[in-house]
Amino acid sequence: SGFSTLVRLKEKEDPTVGRVMEWVKTNRTLASQIDSARVVMESMASEITPCAEVVYKGQAIDKNKFSVIPLGDPHIGLQTWSKEVGHDWDLKIAKRVYKKVFTRLLARSPDTEECVLLNTGDFFHADNIAGETSASAHKLDLDGRPSKWLEVGFQVMQMFIEMCLTKYKSVKFYNVPGNHDDILGAALGVFASILYEKNPRIEVFKGQSPFQYFHKNKVLLGFAHGHKCKLGALPGKMADDQYIMWGNSTHRHWITGHVHHNQWIQYKEWSGASVESVGIIPPKDAYAYGGGFGGRRGTQLIVFDDRVGEWDRKRESVLETD
């Protein structure tokens, strides 16, 4: 913070003050930057032409069951080199692999009337033209320019949503904020809400809150990225945020991302709720590979019965042929 002054050059004999303008410099918080960016994004998104209504081709069998598809940290824009980390990955590969894996997953999953499509955060790998995260300014391994990440990212988002709209009668898209893409992640939710505003079968939760909830009959689900709140504190957070839903439910569960692997060792039943983290499809970047982080690459679909909780779970792994 401080002052900046614009001055006018003057002759030595000129008695007038040379100051033309003075303004205060401030250190804006990340939150205020994101709020400003959201206003700009909503203005830009207003120019988007909403797409035509997607045709439903599914066969809903049991209205008591619903499907939840967690998109574990897609990291669109990530680039890796096989000689360094064991696998090649870029925008072109990401688009191809996501389509193949998601197609196989939906083909072997049961038809339910309702689907919850969940972005667990970090949909984009970086957040600005410098190729960094906005919150921590971490330098990242990236493929191409920001406009390319946006284009491919929105195409992948559209593919996920429209495949779900084709299979399920009702779709809810939850966009959870991550730690890699504070601004571009917010853009994803804004653009999706406008793109599908003429599709009455989808409801878009744009992602203003780091903690989001879905409630149906006796099941209460919580969604978070997992970088701000320790897993053990999430059940209490759910009870505090949604005390009415908490009291009306008997099966309560959190789904998080961030750690890039299925946390079955830490899949625990805390007081009143269970918590898990889901794996991801992209390979490890150089930082994660060097640190020995990460896990098996793949995704999953969880079927819940609104009377008894989790009913079934389908897994789909990334194949070498993908």
Please tell me what each predicted stretch does.
Residues V7-T16, Q158-N175, R252-H261:
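N-terminal short leaders/motifs
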Residues V54-K57, I61-P74, S82, H87-I202:
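Core catalytic region of metal-dependent phosphoesterases/phosphodiesterases
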Residues S1-K92, K99, A107-D111:
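Acidic, histidine-bearing metal-coordination/catalytic regions of metal-dependent phosphoesterases
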Residues T16, L184-A186, Y213-N217, A286:
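Short, solvent-exposed polar/charged micro-motifs at secondary-structure junctions
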Residues H75-I76, F124, H180-D182, K228-C229, ...:
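Short, solvent-exposed loop/turn segments at secondary-structure junctions
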Residues L165, I194-R201, Q208, H215-G222, ...:
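Conserved beta-sheet core of the metallophosphoesterase superfamily
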Residues P177, G207-F211:
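Gly/Pro-rich turn-and-neighbor structural signature
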